[in-house]
């Protein structure tokens, strides 16, 4: 899942 809050980018 690219929309993971762990990444917090712009997805």
Curated annotation (Swiss-Prot):
Keywords: Amidation, Neuropeptide, Secreted. The modification Phenylalanine amide is found at residue 11. It is found in: Secreted. GO terms for cellular component: extracellular region. GO terms for biological process: neuropeptide signaling pathway. Its main location: secreted. It comes from the Eukaryota. Belongs to the NPY family. Neuropeptide. This is Short neuropeptide F.
């Amino acid at each position: 899942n690219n929309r993971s809050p762990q990444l917090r980018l712009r997805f």
